[in-house]
A protein has these predicted regions:
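Non-heme Fe(II)/2-oxoglutarate
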Residues: 1-86
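Catalytic core of non-heme Fe(II) oxygenases with the double-stranded beta-helix
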Residues: 102-163, 171-175, 180-195
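Acidic/histidine-enriched, glycine/proline-rich intrinsically disordered or flexible terminal extensions
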Residues: 191-205
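A short coil-to-beta-strand element that immediately follows conserved catalytic motifs
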Residues: 87-96
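Conserved active-site beta-strand element of glycosyltransferases/polysaccharide synthases
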Residues: 99
Length: 205
């Protein structure tokens, strides 16, 4: 299905128990970040254990993290399944996790090169569908994809517009896992999003 439509859904890509464990870990990390920031033990500009996105980022005021080590490990765990469903050999690029809050909205967009073969996985929280436009045409209505805990949408991030309407729930923990097709020109040089290895922050390139 992926090769034809450029997207597919993997139901129970990971177990609900594992999804809950990873989500609880990330929620606790947010709590640690909040406490340390409030007590001024860390700079508000420090992002090595996450940060709240600024006005120039996709979801202002929402806690997120590039390259959380648990999420990067999850990306490697999911890589064999990703290669199976896409029929491609992949290089891991990076991960990005968020704890969405009520009122958040993910605007329609396409992704950068490191997100060539992407996933979004539901780890925990209230339901929040994602939409994508399989034709690749900008501005079309698109299709709705519902993901339950542990489910994962696989899609061509650079080709298909994707978005989420305004979130009406309380909290939703999601992670994006990003890969490159090994046969794509430039993919090898882009491995790990041009970092020396996985787990490093975005500025370590």
């Amino acid at each position: 299905m992926f090769k034809k439509k450029k997207y597919t859904v993997i139901r129970q890509a990971i177990s609900k128990d594992l999804a809950t464990f990873v989500a609880n870990y990330f929620v606790m990390q947010k709590q640690v970040y909040d406490t340390c920031k409030q007590a001024r033990y860390i700079s508000p500009f420090e992002n090595i254990i996450g940060h709240y996105e600024g006005q120039d980022e996709q979801i202002p005021g929402t806690y997120s993290q590039y390259s959380n080590i648990a999420m990067e490990t999850l990306m490697l765990k999911c890589q064999p399944k990703m290669e199976e469903v896409t029929g491609l050999k992949l290089y891991p690029a990076y991960t990005y996790a968020r704890i969405y809050k009520k009122g958040d909205e993910l605007k329609r967009h396409k992704d950068r090169f490191s997100c060539e073969i992407s996933t979004t996985m539901n780890l925990a929280g209230d339901d929040w569908p994602i939409y994508l436009e399989p034709s690749g045409e900008v501005g079309k209505k698109g299709i709705k994809v519902d993901l339950k805990q542990g489910d994962m949408l696989v899609y061509s991030g650079c080709e298909l517009e994707h978005w989420r309407n305004k979130f009406r729930g309380k909290e939703c923990v999601q992670v994006f896992l990003h890969y490159n097709n090994r046969k794509t020109p430039g993919a090898k040089d882009n491995m790990f999003d041009k970092r020396p290895h996985l787990g490093l922050p975005s500025w370590f390139k």
